[in-house]
Amino acid sequence: AEEVTVWEKHKEGIMSEHIWAPELHYLDGKWYIYFAGGDKDDIWAIRPYVLECADADPLTGAWTEKGKMGRADADEFSFEAFSLDATVFENKGKHYYVWAEKVGVGKQISNLYIGEMETPYKLKTVQVLLTSPDYDWERVGFWVNEGPAVIHHDGRIYLTYSASETGAAYCMGMLTADEDSDLLDPKSWTKERYPVLRTDDSRGIYGPGHNSFTEDEEGNPVMVYHARTEAEIEGNPLYNPNRHAMLMKIRWDEKTGAPIFSYED
């Protein structure tokens, strides 16, 4: 399909620099784009923002800015610091918002948080910490959990995320919860001890991560992710843009029902 520009970044102020990680979602009869952006005068003041389209076709409809994602009235923490990579999912008639946000002084840590949504652009509940970079493979270069994505299957919710710096060490982890559990209770989620997808030197695929899930024309699940084709990067990998979009078919484990992430697919 032909690319269509639906919005342009501001020339100054908020939403004027580092426009990152857009996701398109359909909620309550309208289209929404969730993205992160910075400020030309403070380029690392990355915060989450929302665009809305009330027309049936998001390619031709008019988009309006809903501004910065709103936190719950009792929440004094969410979106105060570097926040990005938001995704949205529905379960049992409720919508949930998951995002990455940094905490700490000096060497900062990027955690994943979840909140129930009151509207498509405001949270209903105070944020809940889902996962922090606990393991060594989540702490290479930087201590990072980011890029959440959700897929449902057979009564289970699978939440993938990306970890470590964005070079060859970048990889995917996963959390799992029962769809009937309290998704705002961290105890409902089980975290995989090891990455579910990582660098495969034999295939020349390095640092896979920040994936999303969609379906092909026949309704089969497909994962879209980015990865590098070179192992070595000069300088800080954060400033190296050479990451490529890739596709992977998703199969399901016959015993556990969990998604299988395999380069063979």
Residue spans of the language-model regions?
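Carbohydrate-active catalytic/glycan-binding domains of CAZyme proteins
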Residues: 1-265
